[in-house]
Amino acid sequence: MSSMTPQEIVSELDRHIVGQNGAKRAVAIALRNRWRRQQVDASLRHEITPKNILMIGPTGVGKTEIARRLARLADAPFIKVEATKFTEVGYVGKDVDSIVRDLVEVAVKQTREADMKKVRVRAEDAAEDRILDVLIPPARGAGVDTARTGEPAGDSTARQVFRKKLREGQLDDKEIEIDLADARPQFEIMSPAGMEEMTEQLRGMFSQMGQERRRARKLKIAEAMKLLVEEEAAKLVNEEEVKTRALANAEQNGIVFIDEIDKVASRQEAGGADVSRQGVQRDLLPLVEGTTVSTKYGMVKTDHILFIASGAFHLAKPSDLIPELQGRFPIRVELTSLSVQDFEAILTQTHASLVKQYQALLETEGVTLDFTPEGITRLAHIAFEVNERTENIGARRLSTVMERLLDEVSYDATRLSGQTVVVDAGYVNARLQSLSQDEDLSRYIL
């Protein structure tokens, strides 16, 4: 898992997310504590449980983006789920245990990919040998030497010449016929909600039936090389060891991000749909507190999985969550609404800002977009004003406004090839001011 310091994590998040320093610090400390726990003596390590985080803030201020960026930094099994997808056991919908099953799937995939990278050099050598065996069939009686030295006796010079050409890509377009494992047919089974695990087991059982079949395929060497490397790497990876390590990784380092947690908060004691909402909260309790979940790879304990929940809490309040669940999220972080200055920073300072994205897109058509500082300031003001007068959707408003602003340029890009379009305050006002001031229009268009 990642050994980045809290300062390094916050610095990396700053490249993509403006403001929200409290939330960044909280997730940075939580991520660093995962690493610290691994350094503690084994006798005490089991007693140290993660401090779960609840992020509270309006939509579009960076809650989900923090989760997305954290997934890349964590170098640990990470899954993001929507609380609204789950229902109480017995109702139509997914049960919360599937969160852990999905996390384990991520861990297995992550571990397998890491192991395949380690054996890639050996797999590439084996794939090269198989291709060379087709191009220069080994002489009879050379089998012993081939197994011992990797080069057929009496044929090493020609083989080395072809190996050099193969590595330099000179033979990529040559077509050869090779034997490849025929992928077992996938049995598609439609499963009722809540029975995904049983369906997966049935699918796995059917796919294992019968022996592995091989068939000859005609392919270009470049494509054959990719397929052979994958096949050889799969042979070198110990699947049982992968599963064992993946289970341990999910248990010790797993991170679950639960978005839209406010949507399962009940505002009052009521029947109907709220029964299912409270049921989801009750089902989440043992998962967050620590329980054992059965997966197809084995049993998984959730005691040391870190849970980060987030919600806008427009209609409900954090206190509307059942008290037991509130207690399972001891760290609470409030994210603030975005100001005009924040909008400007989002447009100019982030690593992959909307300005850079649109410039890169239109550059493919030969159109140069030049945003002046005044144009960006005016754009930020309009996005902020529309948010204030209509629904506040945070930074997502910038995407809507930018799309409307550059609608004509995007449409006529082929005709404008070779030209420079200057986006200044006048350009922005001409295309957006009337819309932003008309509340009825801005409600539907911006």
From Swiss-Prot:
GO terms for biological process: protein unfolding; proteolysis involved in protein catabolic process. ATP binds at residues 18, 60-65, 259, 324, 396. It is found in: Cytoplasm. It comes from the Bacteria. Its main location: cytoplasm. Keywords: ATP-binding, Chaperone, Cytoplasm, Nucleotide-binding, Stress response. GO terms for molecular function: ATP binding; ATP hydrolysis activity; peptidase activity; proteasome-activating activity. One of its GO terms (cellular component) is HslUV protease complex. The keyword Phosphoprotein does not apply. A double ring-shaped homohexamer of HslV is capped on each side by a ring-shaped HslU homohexamer. The assembly of the HslU/HslV complex is dependent on binding of ATP. Belongs to the ClpX chaperone family. HslU subfamily. This is ATP-dependent protease ATPase subunit HslU. It comes from Acidovorax sp. (strain JS42).
